[in-house]
Swiss-Prot record:
Effect of C273S: Loss of palmitoylation. Decreases surface expression but presynaptic terminals targeting. No effect on ligand binding
Membrane topology of the entry: Multi-pass membrane protein
Gene from which the chain derives: Chrna4
Cytoplasmic-side positions: 334-604
Protein name: Neuronal acetylcholine receptor subunit alpha-4
Molecular function per GO: acetylcholine binding; acetylcholine receptor activity; acetylcholine-gated monoatomic cation-selective channel activity; heterocyclic compound binding; monoatomic ion channel activity; protein-containing complex binding; quaternary ammonium group binding; transmitter-gated monoatomic ion channel activity involved in regulation of postsynaptic membrane potential
Disulfide bonds: C163-C177, C227-C228
Record PANTHER family: NEUROTRANSMITTER GATED ION CHANNEL (PTHR18945)
Tissue expression as described in the entry: In various regions of the central nervous system. Expressed in hippocampal neurons.
UniProt GO cellular component terms: acetylcholine-gated channel complex; cation channel complex; cholinergic synapse; dendrite; dopaminergic synapse; external side of plasma membrane; membrane; neuron projection
Extracellular side: 32-249
Length: 630
């Protein structure tokens, strides 16, 4: 009653089910047990009495052939300073052990098994050029054993192999690093190496961000060392790796080139701006800071070789330093003057004549020519003769001179006088002068207005016109003279007319438009053609020395000087002084301009020199790596 109440199946119903399950699982379990027992039996048979210290050869004179190969997984690092290459590789080894053979039919068709490598004999193949760490494989993985006695063992290893790294063409360098594998104990008579493949297996290679493997070739070598009489074989793998230069080009080479270009621009900057030395020092400071920043980028310095980029940086540093020295020298030349330096003849010849032609430089001369014309004109005006050496009756010459406006009579006024009323204009135009005797002009005649004085008559009683010179002489009367003469004017034009008898005549200016009138020729005295109001009374002039006169018949008397007033003398001396001063300044200015031009030529020379050197340095930096690669 209790069993029926719980609902459990009767034992008789469970028995057939258990029988069915047992009959179905027995074959599989028996097969697994049989194979496990087969491998166990195989291992017991193989390693019973097996000695892993002896070479796996039937005859002592036989040679164990070890097939060797290498598969690279990663190029970890290339240390230029310590001269070593770190790689992650798989060392492939394969040999035959006659003591580890069996018949698969005796062991449930077991053809291969995995066994610990510590239990079997292994060739002692090591990395000869190991730089750091263990020479041999440290991680002993299991070996794959086949029924014919073939053993395959592929342990992983991280090697630090020594490598002679040449960083001359950094960052465009290409290195050749080798890994030499061979038996450390057995010579060629005991163990011989056979290469599995001629190249390194790169199927599982993980690409590096800085290096790329161009080629990796394995070669078989034999060598007799000094320590031993035997010959030892080895397989050497040569890894040809190339650096990827993009990072270094952006962060190292381009800034160096830009700094070099800034150094070249120093010589293109004019010396007048005064910022040449500032630019040089700024470039030098920027280069110094840049060198401090890139010490971690470029390979660490060694005593073996110096990278081209290091030489280029050193060259740029010297470049900038020389530019500072040359700039100081150029500025010194630029600011030289005749008072401090005398320009040698060879400097003038080389830097003002020869070099500018070679550099296709053309010196502008407009300003210098203008200054020279100004000085020459002032000297002509100041140094002209103060007498008339030629006859004045030639109408053509006089007409041309007067038409050109070359005989102005400047107006000088007494500051104490004032002109309240509008006065007639007294000018000194060409006019007709009668023949006067000295006795006829001894007394002054009142002239109520200009031109109102009656023309004097000759000894025969008829007015006579002669050819004579007229000169408007500036005269500034003093207060006493003005009171005595009754003159109230800002200027007074006095005509000295020379008759045929050599006597000087005095007449007020009288405008005329007669075509036959005599035109006055200008002297070197300051004169003016400006009209000035005046109200004057003609007065007998002081005795003057006769000037050049025309004798009867057109002959010319010897030239005689016209006396000048003190004011005119001082004016002429002032003009002479100004002309001499301007001439001296022009000479100084010319010499200064020559020194400035010499400085410009020196700047241009070093500009082209630095451009050429910069281009050659750049080509020398980029070209050799490509030539070496070819």
């Amino acid at each position: 009653m209790a069993n029926s109440g719980t609902g459990a199946p009767p034992p008789l119903l469970l028995l057939p089910l258990l029988l069915l399950l047992g009959t179905g699982l027995l074959p599989a379990s028996s097969h697994i047990e049989t194979r496990a027992h087969a491998e166990e039996r195989l291992l017991k048979r193989l390693f019973s009495g097996y000695n892993k210290w002896s070479r796996p050869v039937a005859n002592i004179s036989d040679v164990v052939l070890v097939r060797f190969g290498l598969s690279i997984a990663q190029l970890i690092d290339v240390d230029e300073k310590n001269q070593m290459m770190t790689t992650n590789v798989w060392v492939k080894q394969e040999w035959h052990d006659y003591k580890l053979r069996w018949d698969p039919g005796d062991y449930e068709n077991v053809t291969s098994i995995r066994i610990p490598s510590e239990l079997i004999w292994r060739p002692d193949i090591v990395l000869y050029n190991n730089a750091d760490g263990d020479f041999a494989v440290t991680h002993l993985t299991k070996a794959h054993l086949f029924y014919d006695g073939r053993v395959q063992w592929t342990p992983p290893a991280i090697y630090k192999s020594s490598c002679s790294i040449d960083v001359t063409f950094f960052p465009f360098d290409q290195q050749n690093c080798t890994m030499k594998f061979g038996s450390w104990t057995y010579d060629k008579a005991k163990i011989d190496l056979v290469s599995m493949h001629s190249r390194v297996d790169q199927l599982d290679f993980w690409e590096s961000g800085e290096w790329v493997i161009v080629d990796a070739v394995g070669t078989y070598n034999t060598r007799k060392y000094e320590c031993c009489a035997e010959i030892y074989p080895d397989i050497t793998y040569a890894f040809i790796i190339r650096r990827l230069p993009l990072f270094y080009t952006i962060n190292l080479i381009i800034p160096c080139l830009l700094i070099s270009c800034l150094t070249v621009l120093v010589f293109y900057l004019p010396s007048e701006c005064g910022e040449k030395v500032t630019l040089c020092i700024s470039v030098l400071l920027s280069l110094t800071v840049f060198l401090l920043l890139i010490t971690e980028i470029i390979p660490s310095p060694t005593s073996l070789v110096i990278p081209l980029i290091g030489e280029y940086l050193l060259f740029t540093m010297i470049f900038v330093t020389l530019s500072i020295v040359i700039t100081v020298f150029v500025l010194n030349v630029h600011h030289r003057s005749p008072r401090t330096h005398t320009m040698p003849a060879w400097v003038r010849r080389v830097f003002l004549d020869i070099v500018p032609r070679l550099l296709f430089m053309k010196r502008p001369s407009v300003v210098k020519d203008n200054c020279r014309r100004l000085i020459e004109s002032m000297h002509k005006m100041a140094n002209a003769p103060r007498f008339w050496p030629e006859p004045v009756g030639e109408p053509g010459i006089l007409s041309d001179i007067c038409n050109q406006g070359l005989s102005p009579a400047p107006t000088f006024c007494n500051p104490t006088d004032t002109a309240v009323e509008t006065q007639p204009t007294c000018r000194s135009p060409p006019l007709e002068v009668p023949d006067l005797k000295t006795s006829e002009v001894e007394k002054a005649s009142p002239c109520p207005s200009p031109g109102s004085c009656p023309p004097p008559k000759s000894s025969s009683g008829a007015p006579m016109l002669i050819k004579a010179r007229s000169l408007s002489v500036q005269h500034v009367p003093s207060s006493q003279e003005a009171a005595e003469d009754g003159i109230r004017c800002r200027s007074r034009s006095i005509q000295y007319c020379v008759s045929q008898d050599g006597a000087a005549s005095l007449a007020d200016s009288k405008p005329t438009s007669s075509p036959t009138s005599l035109k006055a020729r200008p002297s070197q005295l300051p004169v003016s053609d400006q009209a000035s109001p005046c109200k004057c009374t003609c007065k007998e002039p002081s005795p003057v020395s006769p000037v050049t006169v025309l004798k009867a018949g057109g002959t010319k008397a010897p030239p005689q000087h016209l006396p000048l007033s003190p004011a005119l003398t001082r004016a002429v001396e002032g003009v002479q002084y100004i002309a001499d001063h301007l001439k001296a300044e022009d000479t100084d200015f010319s010499v200064k301009e020559d020194w400035k031009y010499v400085a410009m030529v020196i700047d241009r020379i070093f500009l082209w020199m630095f451009i050429i050197v910069c281009l050659l340095g750049t080509v020398g930096l980029f070209l050799p790596p490509w030539l070496a690669a070819c």
